[in-house]
């Protein structure tokens, strides 16, 4: 049963692995083994099985088998079953037979062995999320708290904490019980600390929390031992953070302890609590912030001072604190010049946040003192190249980049200061180059980087053995050259020094340099590097991918040299690269549902390459339409025909029709980029911005042609929006063609001497616009990295898809309805980067369509232009990455139908992503003879 239902989730990764049924059978054999070692090995492999096959039927069967082992096995096996339950918490709600699972585990509570009972209590606590309101379990936990065995009591405390987090009724019922145990004089300090930690979850809401807080505060005086006080502080802080309304009182209490308690560990615990409550900075009273500054000033312990600064670091993320941070700013200004570089770095970070906020809100502020402090910190960290100084250096460099972003006048000074420190080696050199690259990636790169150019060239002549440092060095040079190319024409002579510097480095370093060159539109340099890399590729897939990148980069380089004349050849090269890029990424076998080319299967680089090929082909059509005015002059009757048709552009003859067709092709290219952006769920923000910019640019070009060939030539609605303003140097490069087209359009249509219709002046403007569009745009990061942007999702459809011939179609009487059941799994993907979190799947939109087949004898049927007779849409919420849906399908006419099911993701912001995958089955609807109303002869007895 399991194998039949789960085999449709076939994995196309190419890794020879077992299916779910075989894997479960193998683990079951291990569980039934008479050797404890084999049983343990089988038990610990279950979490991996759940991650790979997170299907309810498998998980339910597995947990029932584990419950049997827990009931019949020894304590050692029970311990490993407990670990499996703790590690597989997100899959627990897929257990279907909860009662049977609970019965098998609960039976161990009747054992005479207190360790077995303790393990049972901990196991019940681990699965509290699926049995939160079971009264028999609540009673067992209460009975465990009254036990005379310490192990069982500790297990009951753990179970209490777990159940209280899921059941408010249980939390309220157990609050008095735990309070009595805490106040009991016979309770030991260690046990009391555990009970106090349990009180964090049993407060039962803001109203009930008042009594718990009162109890915990009384414990601070009644039981002054360090362990009890620290446990009470932790519990008080957690409850205040949960209820929010008690944050001001708790902040005052913690500050009082931090300033007056003589014990270092207690003061540290109070400061750690303040660090957690700093997330609610808007609720802090103003005098508490002043007291925090006073505590930091009076502290003689370096660790406590650092904790105070870290609390300030979180507080200043609130704009209200930044606006009224006079004393805080003064303290950080002094601390930023401290001899302790760690303190100075954190204080500088706090001060930078305040100053940047003032610049952004146009408040009066002077960043000169901060600039001096940051420069001094960078120089001070150079005195010792040890690893202890790298962290302060990175904080200072990050602050410099933020300050330059808020106030560009400091950019040149910062670049010069960083370039002066480039003589260092190792991690310090990487940090400095990374800061220069971050500085150059902004909009002020043209003004900032030339100041560092002499030092960068000197470093390039003596390149470091560190591959990452060399890549960063080349990236900074690419940024400087790219920013210069936006305003002037530059020669290619500088590329020789780059090639000489990377000639003898490893292939991975050269590949990263080539990717950076592609991002900043240095296509000829990237093509040279990629050509050599493709000849040295270690595998066939790598050779395909590198060859695809080489062809595409060479096509863009040729486009820069030849201009419009190279459009056709460049389009063909990009088309070839799109096929090779998909194969090189290891994709192309289709998704698990067996579709062909859905957005969930297609890798982002190959799809972007195909879109670029179609866009260049559309530009070639636009250029040909402009030339057609000269190569195919209008006939003599064209003017009369234009007057009769009331179409001024028709006077241009064939050129007008060609221009309109080119406009439609450009609009189609823009729609293709838009569809690509809507399917790239896991793409980084930079890649999505590039796709939106490409969509906007080709939409703008299409509107330009439509305006030329229209009758009124009125100004269309503006395409440029505030969301498409460049924020980085890469976006400036990508938006350069759009800005050029806008200038050409304004020059043409704002000129009063421009005659209406399609004249030679219009043709020259089209050629100029196409030439501007041919300028080599930078590549998106996701395309350079070969990253798949589609969402990883697998679908299984019941009834399962069958072979293509119509004879194998599922039969459906017209009077009946087909019950479709869809099950799917959202698969994890590798993280994009440390700086950008992954988008979360909050919902899955399921679209079911039924499309009739045309009556034809053809073996292959094209359903693109046939409207569906049924469209049903529903949105389901994934539970632990698993989702399921059901849909009834009915048709009203006999024949063959393709029933397609497509999934689309809904992210945390409510945006819909057309990620796929798409799966379908063919059904054959027929009339039921019993419903035709034909009377059948009654058979007689004789």
Predicted regions and their residues:
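Extended, low-complexity, acidic/polar intrinsically disordered regions
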Residues: 1-842, 846-878, 885-916, 921-942
